[in-house]
Amino acid sequence: MFSLTSAMQYYLYSHPTDMRRSFYTLSGMITNLMGRNVQDGDVYIFINRPRTSMKILHMECGGLVIYHMKLESGCFKLPVFDQSTNTFQTSWQDLMMMVQGVMSDEKVKKKRRKKLRNSR
């Protein structure tokens, strides 16, 4: 069950991530590279280099949970990068738009519209 809410803090890892990584490696990246504690209940987002795949890691009461989304076509558009804090400004709304495909490059939207028109 998708149990993420707007009350949680969201952190997008600022470098491309190998999507073969799983619970332990991603947890290590959060601790060692992001300086955060995975058990705080915050949500951590990882995206691969071509921006076609996303993993979301967070801690629930029963343990760690990973959500993995892979786009059939197009790519995720990253939120605005904040140079003062060296992080991406990420919120619940940004994540939902990314997952639902609303926050995507204009070229991708055109490709999707063209595919829809051709399939009719």
Over which residues does each language-model region extend?
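Polybasic/polar functional segments that serve as interface/processing modules
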Residues: 1-120
